[in-house]
C-alpha cells in the first residue's frame, strides 16, 4: 500500500524509561536474570568431563569383591515382578559377595510411587541395603546416580532404565547390571563369564 504524499506517519508517544518508572526496574531485573542464566549455562558447558581415556580398553581396577552395587527404582520393581531376590541374584550373577546401595533420591522416588509399590518400599528399607545420603537438592534419582558414579568409579549400577543405561555407557569403567529374561546380566565387566 502506497502512502499518500504529504502525510506524515503518526507518532506514537513512547513511554519514558527512567528509574522512576516501574517498567524500567522490572526490565532491568529481567535483563540481569537472563545474564546470570547465560553465565551459568556457559560455566556448565565449559566444565570438562573427566572421561579417563586410559580406561577405555581396560577395566576398572577399583571394582573388587565385595562389589558395591547402586540400585535404581525400576530395577527393584522389575525384580519384584519377576520374583527375584535382589541380593542372592546379584551374587549369582557377579560370582561374589555384593553390597547393595540405595540413595536417598531412589528411596524418595519409591515413596512417591504410592501404595501400589509397598513391596518395593519394604525392600528398600531392608537393613541389608546400605543407604547413601544425598547432599544435593531435588530428588531425581538418575542424575543422583550419574553424579555419584562419575565421582567414585567403584560402583556397579543396577538399572533397567534404557535412558540411564545409555548415559552410563558414556562413562568408562562403570559396569551395568540389568534384567534380561528372568535373570540378571552384567554389561562391561570383562572378568566375568557372560
From Swiss-Prot:
GO terms for biological process: ribosomal small subunit biogenesis; rRNA processing. Residues 17-33 have a biased composition (Polar residues). This is rRNA-processing protein FCF1 homolog. Residues 1-41 are annotated as: Disordered. Part of the small subunit (SSU) processome, first precursor of the small eukaryotic ribosomal subunit. During the assembly of the SSU processome in the nucleolus, many ribosome biogenesis factors, an RNA chaperone and ribosomal proteins associate with the nascent pre-rRNA and work in concert to generate RNA folding, modifications, rearrangements and cleavage as well as targeted degradation of pre-ribosomal RNA by the RNA exosome. Keywords: Nucleus, Ribosome biogenesis, rRNA processing. It comes from Dictyostelium discoideum. One of its GO terms (cellular component) is nucleolus. Pfam families: Fcf1. Residues 67-166 form the PINc domain. Its main location: nucleus. Part of the small subunit (SSU) processome, composed of more than 70 proteins and the RNA chaperone small nucleolar RNA (snoRNA) U3. It comes from the Eukaryota. SMART domains: PINc (SM00670). It is found in: Nucleus, Nucleolus. Belongs to the UTP23/FCF1 family. FCF1 subfamily.
